[in-house]
């Protein structure tokens, strides 16, 4: 087995014969938290290198393989998928080719960077708070966070079993949809076109980089001319959302899924990741139970208020930051939280969400978010919007 040493990959896969199928000839990068038979699943961590090789493919990997895809290698990622910026001190940090010296975003960092460079055609990733959509925006590709229950996560190393979703990225929407059709289980999608989009007045539109704000504002008339109804108003469920200690989910649940590494070889874990995992000690069992109950209330309230409508936001409040700007912990934490802010909404409401690149502003994305089982509707809407953003 040859080893890829670029920061986009942690290891390459040996060539294999592939069956004919809907993804024949499609090169797929697999985020390094999905089991691939015969390879160690490191989840971007030196602490997992001692684990045995996977004995079988993760469900999503098996579906891609059966559809004729060519599996290229394990894509690099934030260790344990625990940040939205994509830094990895062990295997290198993937960068966006769109902005000199800027990061690719995370945690599906290597997949997005490899896509943007044309090394792969599809990146299989996960999204806990934006880990498909943030790097998609930063690298100028399309990232889909589907309804969590629509794609199996069996055989994928979890960060937060409450918020994790499995999904694809690609350079264009058509390829994302082909991959989603292969990966997703038959389900009763909610009917009705997604034509009414709400820009919330009480969430997601502050602290925007000038380039992001300008690109977003310029996109709205294009959507309206294409037949979308875009309304700026307050969403009441977001007032409840503001009360949620979102950090609880990944902090507490990562300590469950990575207990062996955290407790037995903590010195091998990225200090930035370890610090966030340590925050779980600040949440009691009662407090976390309250967080789960509040999240369930938010899901119900969002579904009731949005109905067949969707939320329209910039994918990320900021343009891709320079790697050099993230050296200090305080700066890293501030930028990480701002990067995750808009995308995390889709995970908390148990919805579906997609980021589309805005071609005129490298590193900026337009994001549609809707309640659960509106995946087909959001993909149909995105198909109408994608060409508008290429102008």
Tell me what each language-model feature is.
Residues 1-58, 81-83, 216:
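Short, well-ordered alpha-helical
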Residues 48-55, 92-107, 332-339:
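Short pre-catalytic strand/loop immediately N-terminal to key active-site residues, enriched for Gly-Thr
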Residues 56, 100-112, 125-126, 130-131, ...:
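Gly/Ser-rich catalytic serine loop of serine hydrolases
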């Amino acid at each position: 087995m040859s080893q890829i040493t670029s920061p986009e990959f942690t290891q390459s896969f040996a060539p294999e014969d592939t069956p004919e199928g809907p993804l024949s000839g499609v090169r797929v990068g697999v985020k390094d938290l999905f089991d691939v038979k015969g390879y160690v699943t490191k989840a971007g961590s030196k602490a997992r290198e001692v684990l045995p090789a996977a004995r079988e493919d993760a469900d999503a990997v098996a579906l891609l393989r059966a559809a004729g895809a060519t599996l290229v290698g394990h894509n690099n990622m934030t260790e344990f998928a625990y940040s939205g910026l994509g830094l990895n001190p062990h295997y290198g940090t993937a960068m966006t080719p769109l902005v000199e010296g800027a990061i690719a975003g995370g945690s599906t960092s290597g997949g997005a960077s490899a896509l943007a460079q044309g090394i792969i055609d599809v990146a299989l990733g996960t999204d806990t708070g934006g880990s498909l959509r943030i790097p998609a925006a930063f690298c100028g590709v399309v990232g889909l966070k589907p309804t969590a229950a629509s794609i199996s996560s069996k055989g994928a190393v979890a960060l937060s079993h409450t918020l994790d979703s499995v999904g694809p990225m690609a350079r264009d929407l058509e390829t994302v949809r082909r991959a989603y059709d292969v990966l997703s289980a038959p389900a009763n999608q909610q009917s009705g076109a997604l034509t009414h989009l709400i820009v919330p007045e009480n969430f997601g539109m502050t602290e925007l980089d000038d380039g992001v704000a300008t690109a977003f504002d310029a996109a709205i008339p294009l959507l309206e001319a294409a037949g979308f109804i875009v309304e700026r108003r307050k969403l009441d469920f977001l007032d409840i959302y503001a009360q949620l200690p979102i950090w609880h989910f990944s902090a507490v649940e990562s300590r469950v899924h990575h207990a062996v590494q955290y407790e037995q070889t903590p010195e091998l874990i990225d200090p930035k990741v370890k610090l966030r995992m340590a925050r779980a000690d600040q949440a009691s069992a009662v407090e976390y139970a309250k967080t789960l109950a509040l999240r369930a209330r938010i899901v119900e309230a969002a579904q009731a208020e949005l109905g067949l409508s969707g939320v329209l936001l910039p994918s990320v409040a900021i343009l891709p930051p320079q790697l050099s700007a993230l050296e200090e912990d305080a700066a890293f934490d501030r930028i990480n939280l701002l990067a995750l802010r808009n995308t995390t909404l889709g995970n908390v409401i148990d919805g579906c969400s997609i980021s589309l690149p805005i071609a005129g502003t490298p590193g900026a994305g337009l994001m549609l978010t809707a309640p659960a089982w509106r995946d087909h509707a959001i993909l149909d809407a995105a198909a109408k919007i994608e060409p508008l953003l290429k102008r």
